[in-house]
Amino acid sequence: MISDQPHRLVEGLEGRFKDLEIEFHRAYWDSQVEATPESEGRRAELELELRRIKGDPDALAAVEGALQDDIHEPVLKRQLEVLRLSLLDNQMQEPQRELLVELSSAVESDFASFRPELEGRTVSDNEIDEILRSSNDPDLRRSAWEASKEVGALVAGRVRELARVRNEMARDLGYPDYYRMSLDLQEMPEEWLFDVMERLEQLTEEPFRDWKSDLDRRLRERFSTQQLYPWHYADPFFQQTPPDGRVSLDDALQNVSASELCSKTFGSWGIDLGSVLDASDLFPRDRKCQHAFCLNVDRDGDVRILANVVPGERWVEVMLHESGHAAYDISIDPKLPYLLRRPAHIFVTEAIAIISGRLIRDPEWLTKVAGLGSSEIGAIEADIRSAKAAHSLMFARWVLVMVHFERDLYADPEADLDARWWELVERMQLVTAPPGRSSPDWAAKIHTAVAPVYYHNYLLGEMLASQLEATCARECGGLVGMKEAGTLLAERVFAPGNLMTWSVLIEEATGSSLSPDDFVTGLLTSAS
């Protein structure tokens, strides 16, 4: 029986799913480090059981009833608010629940195990990335780019079906579609969000167009062609800064240990990543997920990073990014209740990861932490700062593609999504679609299927990262090697966990509400 007393209600519900949630996280980890029918089956079984428990309508009714009372304990009230959001996200009919878990598990398994063929042999994502970064053979580049999209055709049907099931669930709860429901459950006002997206589109359009025009000029010379297509760029989705001939750190970082650099970076901020790195799985192999993520298994110190590190700039940046997530997770006040021992919001932890990842293009970090020569970095410092701005511009325009596409996907899963994808790519990224291309390239991005309504958090994270950097510069004199900056982030951002809403946390941490001003100012200053 569900208690109607708020304290006992919270304790009882937490007790019902805490251990199962931890067990599910362990099974999820196992399914990603080695995708087998057994590991996938175990993960799906636990996810279904967890969703059933959280889908209890009586539990939701009890929590909503408790929130109607005049609760004077902020911690208790916040726990009830967090419970409500989690329970509401799982209210669905049993056939919907079973189909949702079946489809999402199958798609994740496909992404973890699928390897396309190129020139008669199986290749990994890392090998495709290397071709697009370095090859001067247009035919090989085209074949590699097309191979990177093959997984999209494999999963597209199931991704559409996932959108239909999610929409059915959302409409049963009174929402127009799953996209709007998800924003509500993320405590994210839709009108405010798209006002920000529109403003960022306008503010970045001219500088991005100017930067890309210069890049395209050099690429046309490099490939001896007047018409550029997606495979001429250095990333399957044109979301990573290309080594454009002026600055690349691949050679300089060829022989460094990414994990050691992360340990040194966060150690200078007073954060010990030793236990995280010891528990992590960092190098590529067959049947392992080819992407990267950080997983907080138990909200009690068991935090792990999955990566596929190979030498060079990209994976050092990825490891810094994921280590930012890990530093946040292990620094949350352990005395907080289990329900509140998580980041204040998805985009707040993304902001910390982005701050960390940006260090790869910080001349001070490259010399003081990575140990590169001052004269070596000094000679390319201006280019490094320009590359930092280019990365922010490129990534902002890429996120705009994903944000608008996802909203359209859930508005109408039956639409011509293949065409809509390329409309957005051409508008936001100024990349020309291949002639006659008619393939579900949108489904080749793993987030579309398994991390729905997530991508806007990256751009909000960019904004908050810049705002926090400005705060650290103002109050601590900077970030690199500054223990005071680590203390500021730990005390104001990490330790509170999810004790308050993201808007309140940002006001308290930076002294102002979330704004794109520092982000736009930073990229325009670096680009000039």
Predicted features and spans:
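N-terminal helix-rich structural modules
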Residues: M1-L154, V453
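Post-HExxH zinc-binding segment in Zn-dependent metallohydrolases
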Residues: M197-E206, P343-A379
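Active-site recognition of the HExxH zinc-binding catalytic motif
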Residues: P311-I330, E350-I354
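Active-site-proximal, well-structured secondary-structure segments within enzyme catalytic domains
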Residues: E119-E130, S134, E146, R160-L306, ...
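Glycine- and acidic
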Residues: A144-V151, L183, E190, T241-D251, ...
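Beta-rich nucleic-acid/ligand-interaction surfaces
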Residues: D281-Q290, L340-E350
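C-terminal, non-catalytic "cap/extension" segments appended to globular domains
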Residues: M1-P6, P37-E40, E81-V82, D177-R180, ...
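Extended, well-ordered alpha-helical scaffold/bundle regions in very large, multi-domain proteins
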Residues: S39-L50, G55-A59, L183, E187, ...
